[in-house]
Amino acid sequence: MDVVNQLVAGGQFRVIKEPLGFVKVLQWVFAIFAFATCGSYNGELRLSVECANKTESDLSIEVEFEYPFRLHQVYFDAPNCRGGTTKVFLLGDYSSSAEFFVTVAVFAFLYSMGALATYIFLQNKYRENNKGPMMDFLATAVFAFMWLVSSSAWAKGLSDVKMATDPENIIKEMDVCRQTGNTCKELRDPVTSGLNTSVVFGFLNLVLWVGNLWFVFKETGWAAPFLRAPPGAPEKQPAPGDAYGDAGYGQGPGGYGPQDSYGPQGGYQPDYGQPAGGGGGGYGPQGDYGQQGYGPQGAPTSFSNQM
């Protein structure tokens, strides 16, 4: 019990909610329905033979047949209207297609159960070295092909079984029914709805296994080289160098450098550092407005270059 509890506790049951595990559950269930509806079939037909001599007639002849539909081994006793009976055998052997269909269904059932247990309890081993998904994909592809072949073969085989067990066709092959004065009638056809259902489940399994190929294929990683990453955001182009000068703001000629506003080449440059007795002009005590400030020698010093 401890081992079971550990397995249950360590199981990743959420995989059943994912497409990979959920489809595997459907495959397991539909495989059961496929081989159960075909392998457990048991049919019966009825007919009557009425002889000219009423005492020799048999008005209720029952003929039973079942899986695997070796009809050539099925017979019934019919009156020959001459005081005796004759063994009448059905025609055909359709066991190959029926047994092939059931065999594929049984193996699909077993594989689905094993794969589902691996998904839940051995997820790490399944993904180790990517071997598990690769083997799973190959097995799924094989089973998809086998479902196609077996379902198609069984659909044809079922059509032949219906023809061989049709009371009208059986009556046509009976010698006693061709004799004058004798009357043969069909009383009941065999019910083959279960066999029809088995064919439907066969093709449903085909759809499930083919569809599951995509989910298993994604687990293999083979699709990674074909998946392109979404394009990234385009890089922002730098502004042209001559938009605001080659050197930028405050970095030399051509920009918006503050050094030229009051630079050495011109501008308002009052000399506040001259001594009081200096003769350089300005507002010193030795000069007035007629000598140095606005003399005929030229314009004021502060505007000599800019004006």
From Swiss-Prot:
Glycosylation sites: 53
InterPro entries in alphabetical order: Marvel, Synaptophysin/porin
A Pfam family reported for this protein in Swiss-Prot or TrEMBL: MARVEL
Protein name stated in the entry: Synaptophysin
Residues with Phosphotyrosine modification: 75, 272, 289
Residue stretches of biased makeup (Gly residues): 247-257, 275-296
Cysteine disulfide partners in this protein: none
Main location per the UniProt record: membrane
Ranges of Low complexity composition bias in the record: 258-274
Family: Belongs to the synaptophysin/synaptobrevin family.
Subunit structure: Homohexamer or homotetramer. Interacts with SRCIN1. Interacts with VAMP2; the interaction is inhibited by interaction of VAPM2 with SEPT8.
Cytoplasmic domain ranges by topology: 1-19, 125-131, 218-307
Protein origin, superkingdom: Eukaryota
Free-text description of this protein's post-translational modifications in UniProt: Ubiquitinated; mediated by SIAH1 or SIAH2 and leading to its subsequent proteasomal degradation. Phosphorylated by SRC.
Native species: Spermophilus citellus (European ground squirrel)
GO terms for biological process, alphabetical: regulation of neuronal synaptic plasticity
Chain segments annotated as coiled-coil in the UniProt record: none
Subcellular compartments: Cytoplasmic vesicle, Secretory vesicle, Synaptic vesicle membrane; Synapse, Synaptosome
Record-linked PROSITE patterns: MARVEL (PS51225), SYNAPTOP (PS00604)
Keyword entries, A-Z: Calcium, Cytoplasmic vesicle, Glycoprotein, Membrane, Phosphoprotein, Repeat, Synapse, Synaptosome, Transmembrane, Transmembrane helix, Ubl conjugation
Topological domain ranges for the Vesicular compartment: 44-100, 156-193
Modified residues (Phosphothreonine): 220
Topology class, membrane: Multi-pass membrane protein
Every MARVEL domain range: 15-221
